[in-house]
Amino acid sequence: CFNAQLAGGETSRVPAGSSAVISIAATGSVARDSLVLRSTGRPGDVLMVTGRLGGSIAHKHLHFMPRIEESDWLVSNFKPTAMMDISDGLAKDLPRLAESSACGFELNFEVLPRQEGCGVDQALGDGEDYELLIAMAPKQVAELQAAWAKRFPNLELTAIGRLVEKGKGITL
């Protein structure tokens, strides 16, 4: 599924009635011109997310496929200024991206794409979404949204806010 190789490992017996513990380490490489960091956003960049947020309490995260194809396409065709996945919830990961980029942020709570049955609080805080959080130059947004709708018609891409100068914006 992910073209990965198992390079080693060790198994041992787990005492009856105990839970198994599995630990995995992964490494990778990326060409410099394909590298997008969370620390390279700029004031004025539009903040976008893929998919819908929230729902881990209802086990949505157990049936999720990482956005590898989508992020590869995005970097190859539009080169975001900053990007990361949302693993700890938007309320934790958006401030991390903004702080790493020496920015503040504004967020439009009304447009947050949410899983069915999820409120704004769940969309912000559930975690385990593994959707992409993207910062894009404003001049690219309309073209990106049109191309995205053609390439990934079953996956939403929603503008949810923007990066602003450090010290401005909101706090989550």
Residue ranges and their predicted role:
Residues 1-172:
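Helix-biased detector of long, well-ordered alpha-helical tracts
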